């Protein structure tokens, strides 16, 4: 992997430091230092350079020799460290005052405060990890479920990157064959065994589709699904919200219009993160507060991934529900929920209406909730039993889609006479799209966008 000099790589001459543990009180706090002056920092703060990779007890002192704290110091000489540079960790007591005091003392020794994600960025620039692995670090820290953590670990261990690298090597081999044919076009030599190339392209396309499915599962685990509850007032939206959330997050009364503002909860269903929104009931009202609540409801519907349109089972689907359906954006999926079967006496069930999939349930008793949970996983395309998925982001999915589109074009034009140059270009486009995932083909703007979302000290 080759990275070219930029302002970012030139800043590697700086020594950086940051608190690496979460803010607040704790038994242990860590100040992490990386860069060429780690040995000098160790001597200044503790009076000696500790043996590499051994935890050594010491007193931490400021530049005037005053004791700040006591704890452990660890020294990792580069390149055998996380960042590939000399790294120092000062592990003291985890009070915020102690940590700030210790960090300030280190910064007074000519060290710069690290930017968010700069330690991981240096690991990437020093070829210790690729870009997908760097992103997996942040994903692992932010994991909201066991499944999300497992998928992030697989990416961190390089499983995602290894599959991408294998595909790039296969595309390189095909490009060599195609470009050799272009170079010797005047010598009546045909290097392309079109049957072989066609078969290889078919295999690459199939592998890309498989990787995309796994990556999409990982993206779902990371980003979750935005689900919005909508409907007329007093149809049980808030009761359904509370049932899904597992506690009484929303106030529930018999008075229509009780919910006047958005109420959001983050929940998980079998490991699938769901960002759930309860909204104000949509109806004709002259009340200023209700009108503002309904404006926010409509705005929330525009940004939804899936809408649960709740109706009263005793009333059925009315013109009011149909009007809400007509307002939904074309790319938003929805499920019709006929609630309150505890009053109508109908059994829980699922069927298909002219307008789409419908469920009959009771938010009060919980009857039919298993059908709703299954429906939400189905709409998201989530498979809890899917093994081998890895942490992925929207940019990864977009890159895989672009690579797949280029391979599709390559397969179509393979049999066209004189299309070798276009074929080679499509293969190159597929290669570059895949290289964006691991960072071998990237811009500094992309790096800035990615690493700025990391926590400081990582």
From Swiss-Prot:
K(+) binds at residues 234, 253, 255, 258. InterPro entries: G_TrmE, GTP-bd, GTP-bd_TrmE_N, GTPase_MnmE, MnmE_dom2, MnmE_helical, P-loop_NTPase, Small_GTP-bd. Its cofactor is K(+). Homodimer. Heterotetramer of two MnmE and two MnmG subunits. Keywords: Cytoplasm, GTP-binding, Hydrolase, Magnesium, Metal-binding, Nucleotide-binding, Potassium, tRNA processing. It is an enzyme of class 3 (hydrolase). GO terms for cellular component: cytosol. Exhibits a very high intrinsic GTPase hydrolysis rate. Involved in the addition of a carboxymethylaminomethyl (cmnm) group at the wobble position (U34) of certain tRNAs, forming tRNA-cmnm(5)s(2)U34. Transmembrane segments: none annotated. The gene is mnmE. It comes from Nitrosococcus oceani (strain ATCC 19707 / BCRC 17464 / JCM 30415 / NCIMB 11848 / C-107). It is found in: Cytoplasm. Belongs to the TRAFAC class TrmE-Era-EngA-EngB-Septin-like GTPase superfamily. TrmE GTPase family. This is tRNA modification GTPase MnmE. Binds 1 potassium ion per subunit. The keyword NAD does not apply. One of its GO terms (biological process) is tRNA methylation.
